[in-house]
Amino acid sequence: YADWNGQIAYTTPNMNGLSFTLGVMQPWNSTASGAVSDASTGSTDTFGFQGQGSYSWTGDFAGKIWAGFFQQEVTGITAANSSTDATAFEVGVSTSIYNINLVAYGYSGEGVGTTALLRDGFDTAGNKRDSDGGYVQATYVIPTGTKLGVSYGVSKLDDNAADAGDGLVKENTMLTIGAYHPLTKHLNLV
């Protein structure tokens, strides 16, 4: 998710390609009114936690695999549901061989919502909504330096019984086909 949030994180030194990151992050308010999740007071009693482990390797068949998690206790959604956890897990792999790069990524969560962290993560009765998604991508760099690529991604948010006819976004998908030519080291023509 591309939400901005304050955090303190520690990343281990690289241990022959293996590394871990653990962090404590600013709590998010899942009950805030308005169009986006909020970092103000309300259901922000406890900090969130996140972490990731990864392994990278080099050579003719270079790549990286990773797995991560997010967890935050959420309080005050309803009087009957005083406390619950929002959780998410992710896994991914990226590999390169010669001029070809392949990426696959997936995630699954409960109470984390979609579009923005904790946005629409719970229904009005305080029940968690399940979310999952991922993407696949393939790119190829031709000898002139131009990169050709295709990518497809999907993000889903499941309904609960209290959601009938509420207009909740059920699924977002995106297909991208592109050509990217470097004009300078830091500027690409798309």
Please place each PLM-identified region on the residue numbering.
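Aromatic-residue hotspot detector
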Residues: 18-20, 46, 160-163, 190
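Detector for outer-membrane/organellar transmembrane beta-barrel domains
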Residues: 44, 51-178, 182
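Short active-site-adjacent structural elements
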Residues: 30-32, 75, 158-161, 186-190
